[in-house]
Amino acid sequence: PNGNRVIYLPPGEYEVSNTLRWPIGAEEGESQKRTILQGAGVLHSVIRVPDGTSAFSGREPKAVIWTGAMPANRLRNAVRDLKIAVGAENPAAVGLQFNASNQGCVRNVVIEAEADSGVTGLDLGYTDEIGSLFVQNLAVKGFEYGISTKWPLNSITFENVVLRDQRRLGWWNYHQMVFLRGLVSYNWVPAIYNERDSWGAMTVMDSQIIGLEPNNADPGIANQRQMYYRNVEVAGYNRAIENSDRNRSQGNWIGAAHLIEDTSHRNVVSQFRHLDESTFAAAGEVRHLPVKETPIVPWGDPNLEWANILDFGADATGETNSSGALQRAIDSGAHTVYLPGGARFRFDGEVQIRGPVRRIIGLEGSCHSESGATWRLVDGQHPEGLEDAPEVVIERLENWKALRGGELELVVQSESARTLVVSSAIGFRVLGMGRGDIFLEDYCGHLELQNPGQSAWCRQITCRRKGSKIRNCGGNLWILGMRAERTGTLIETLDGGVTDATGIFVYSNQGWVDEEPAFFIRNSSAVLSGISERNFNRRPVSLWFRETQGGETRELKSPAWVDLSK
């Protein structure tokens, strides 16, 4: 329990007769966290519930896999690269009840049930305080409900989701903040239901919703709360979108629809644009950054191209500095350098990432620093002149001392023209000081783009320290899903920068500093869409937007769902 351990399922079929539960620790704070279930791929590792399994034949929903209940302490849980298959005559089965906090993911997973079997495929609504977390490359087939997202905390980001053949609803959201890109739904029932009488808020972009029965009276999207749409196609339904939030919404879309960009309500604001009404139709041209997909970096042959940091003198106890060992492993010519699980490495000082290495992987292990560590991605500096890999991935690693305050974050400096990917990592600060693209995924830390013209794409980023969280100085910054807590500006866009952020959650759980803006724009461009706040101490954000263009500064103290710069 709580050990950053990987449970590996080799290729095969694994029959289960009852719920697989995440481990219990000696104390509640040690339970159901830092546990990673890793398969060999959706075609190779299958967890199967046989037909008519007694444990799943009752009336109360029962999970095949359960990963823990509230509070928000389920750090780094993950389910990866496998299939969950529910056989016939299992009406109570829930494919996966998943919970993770700050950083954790469901990636490359298929959940399917036979006809008339199963309640929910992916259940993210069985307990409060789920998230922030990342779901990517998920397919759900069958079940009454494909996906369930509920409760008012802590936001969930999705990318590339396929829903098919649900019996009641494709997706049921109540209260939760959902940030979604790339939904494809083939269904006879509504693809999305965003339920009334809640704080539920959804952003949906780059999605296709296909109805399989055009004469069906159900809408493709049944929205009763707050939604933002961009590049969403709905076809095969009598009504594409039904907005019915007590006459506060903009109305319905009848027949097929292709929404270029719109909101369910009139809640688009701008400090410098004149809006006759608070809609995109009144906003004029709105420019978005092009979306780049995170590059897929080859794994190579572990027997020939991987290097274990222990073989180069690293200290697995963390009592002494292992930066020298990491540098030697990088310079060895290996394509992958790995930090074995179960160890706690200490890194102080500087390491240069150079030469053929293209992946530094923690195998879900942990590290820390006592005096500060900087990993520099540099070009042409290998001591033996070996060629640099075009892309470098740093992934599946926790800097545990930086989890709360951020004072001892491990700094990754991109000084290179090469691509940098940081994925499934906690406790890092990425500095963009070069020309190469930066990709952050399932990331808990902070980001600064310091070199004008450099670009970053972020998919689920969580920022937990006080002070400025993300700073974009003249770069191009794209975000899908951001959660921030503690006081301090969420995003600064400065000196010609361009920020395009969709899905932002502010958890102002420590109050707010009155003169500190949540978002600061100076002689730059920003599109901020899908902004939500949760506050339970009666001291919410008091200054939302400060924008300076030329010599003029304007502020907005009230919240907005969408904010457009000049």
Indicate where each model-derived feature is located.
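Extended, compositionally simple hydrophobic/Ser/Thr-rich segments
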Residues: S132, S148, S155-V161, G170-W171, ...
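A structural signal for short secondary-structure junctions
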Residues: S198-G200, E485, G496-G497, I521-R522
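Short beta-strand segments enriched in hydrophobic/aromatic residues
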Residues: V86, I209, E398-N399, C463, ...
